[in-house]
Amino acid sequence: MDEGFNTFIDLHNAAQFFAGTPYGDTIEANPLHLAATHTTAGEEQPLIANPTEVRDLMWVGYQKPALMLQTLRFEVLGADRFDPAFRDYIRTWAFRHPTPADFFRLMRDASGMELDWFWRDWIYTTARLDQAVDSVSTDSSGHAMVFLSNRGTMILPAELRITYDDGTIESVRLPVEMWNLGPRFSYRLTSAKRVRRVEIDPRHVLPDLRRSNDLWERRP
């Protein structure tokens, strides 16, 4: 995990320091683009694997931990909570030898959020994310109901982008607790306008391995 932390820090620092230069414009601060080619079912190993037994060291040792921290910072905690907690971890454990559990506890206490579900999926398993928009229907009051499913084994918060017939766009963020009762969730829109299109993870920032079910569009 140490090298993954270094990768996370180095990528972001380099992207900011060299911003606006030919080199800076080529830096992929988010290693999400590598996920599809390094997460083959039955081949990927968890981050907690013994380093001497790791087959794909570049992914397990460097890029996946960086992607994990990227996701935690921007999509789970937000930079306003992640950054102070991460700095606190660095100050607290500088020149010492923390274990993964030490990092987990400090991030929980400093951020104020229980993160066991996150560490389980990212570190102890090779869980995969597959969020989907199953369908959209209209209830008796004229409001649209959006039916979502989590078809993978990883859970993460969800972001929806709803496009209405009049061209207006609404963005909705749903917390990870939406999956507490199972892999299906329905969300009732506050607007009664006719829905043209619903997309989950519209910014493509989550490691969703199947994009084909991320979009629902009303048929003409």
Predicted regions and their residues:
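Hydrophobic alpha-helical and helix-loop surface patches within well-folded domains
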Residues: 1-150
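Histidine-centered catalytic/metal-binding microenvironments
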Residues: 216
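Short acidic/polar inter-strand loop motif in beta-rich domains
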Residues: 202-213
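Short, solvent-exposed mixed-charge patches
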Residues: 219-220
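Intrinsically disordered, low-complexity regions enriched in Ser/Pro/Gly/Gln/His and often acidic
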Residues: 111-115, 172, 209
